[in-house]
Amino acid sequence: MQSNQLDYLPIFMQMGLAVGFVVLTIIGSSFLGPKRSSVNKDKNFESGIESIGNARVPFSVKYFLVAILFVLFDVEVIFLYPWAINFQELGMQGMIKMVIFMSLLLVGFFYIIKKKALEWD
């Protein structure tokens, strides 16, 4: 299959139109929109309820650790999809590589369990 530079022209035109639309919309709204400022408009709004106290409550590091572990294992599971699509073409060599990959994931998961990273004590 031979690729020509003109084959990419519709893609670049679409990207240019999308970026141009966004830029023109932002510039147009700043010129056309009202610019009245008042104390009532500048107040924080949260579902019509008056805010009380400070909104900056410290979170436990456990939440961030669980979120990072979720993203880590979620991204690794995404690698299973191309393997499943090309399973027949990869043959036994692809199967062995995937077993090694999954065993590394399992070792990492057991390490997390051993370090008690998911316990909420």
Curated annotation (Swiss-Prot):
Task: Note the superkingdom of the native organism.
Answer: Bacteria
Q: Which Pfam families match?
A: Oxidored_q4
Compartment list:
Cell inner membrane
Q: Which UniProt keywords apply?
A: Cell inner membrane, Cell membrane, Membrane, NAD, Quinone, Translocase, Transmembrane, Transmembrane helix, Transport
Read off the InterPro entries from this record: NAD(P)H_OxRDtase_bac/plastid (IPR023043), NADH_UbQ/plastoQ_OxRdtase_su3 (IPR000440), NDAH_ubi_oxred_su3_sf (IPR038430)
The entry assigns this protein to a family as follows: Belongs to the complex I subunit 3 family.
HAMAP family given in the database record: NDH1_NuoA (MF_01394)
Instruction: Supply the name of the protein.
Output: NADH-quinone oxidoreductase subunit A
Q: Which source organism?
A: Flavobacterium psychrophilum (strain ATCC 49511 / DSM 21280 / CIP 103535 / JIP02/86)
Gene expressing this chain: nuoA
